[in-house]
């Protein structure tokens, strides 16, 4: 369910020259691994379910937190209640725990979005990750496990684009969208086709101004 990244190639715009990071020159281990998110989440959930010292309360959400010097009480949307000595807020960029604690954030928008999709291609990717720095932002081609696994015929794309153009691009039909992808992707992997839905995520900087409060930490 994973694909190793053996080499990384970085290029600037249309230049035919590239910077090559070769795993054989750094000890032989992969530079990293690509794991599709749903596989990673399932593995985490199964490990939590098997742990003797963890109680999984899901699906559920925290409706309200009450903190004092003695501990924390969490009221759940299901009506249940949990009490602990410490609450760890690991609930993402729109953290309810952080908001409830009144912890402010510093934010900066890059006026860019990341368009993400999976493509199937004709040729083997050889477990090489490519990153191209284009005027609108980076365009990354990341190797995924093939279908069948040894085929090396699937990659994840992360296409950085200006926010002003993102709605138009996401509104294209599949044929027109792939035509735009090919302009940036090239033809070194042969013919390409979409292998799943497209997603778009805003790109921004955000960090909490404090990481600790009474009986609370952010992770």
Predicted features along the sequence, with ranges:
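C-terminal catalytic lobe of FAD-dependent flavoproteins
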Residues: 215-219
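Conserved FAD-binding catalytic core of PHBH/FMO-like flavoproteins
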Residues: 71-73, 86-203, 207-212
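A short, N-terminal amphipathic alpha-helix
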Residues: 1, 45-49, 124, 183-184
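Conserved N-terminal helical subregion
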Residues: 3-100, 108-113
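A short, aromatic/hydrophobic, helix- or strand-capping loop or linear motif
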Residues: 1-3, 193
């Amino acid at each position: 369910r994973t694909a190793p990244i053996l080499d990384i190639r970085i290029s600037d715009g249309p230049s035919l020259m590239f910077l090559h990071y070769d795993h054989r020159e750094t000890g032989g281990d992969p530079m990293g691994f690509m794991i599709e998110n749903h596989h990673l989440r399932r593995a985490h959930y199964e490990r939590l379910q098997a742990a003797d010292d963890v109680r999984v309360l899901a699906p559920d959400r925290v409706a309200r937190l009450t903190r004092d010097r003695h501990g924390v009480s969490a009221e759940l949307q299901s009506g249940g209640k949990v009490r602990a000595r410490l609450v760890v807020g690991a609930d993402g960029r729109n953290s309810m725990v952080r908001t409830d604690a009144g912890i402010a954030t510093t934010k900066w928008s890059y006026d860019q979005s990341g368009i993400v999709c999976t493509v199937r291609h004709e040729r083997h990717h050889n477990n090489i990750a490519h990153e191209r720095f284009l005027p609108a932002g980076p365009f990354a081609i990341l190797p995924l496990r093939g279908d069948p696994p040894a085929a090396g015929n699937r990659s994840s794309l992360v296409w950085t684009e200006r926010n002003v153009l993102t709605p138009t691009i996401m509104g294209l039909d599949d044929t027109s969208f792939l035509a735009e992808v090919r302009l940036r992707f090239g033809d070194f992997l042969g013919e390409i086709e979409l292998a799943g839905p497209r997603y778009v995520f805003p790109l921004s900087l955000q960090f909490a101004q404090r990481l600790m409060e009474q009986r609370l930490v952010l992770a």
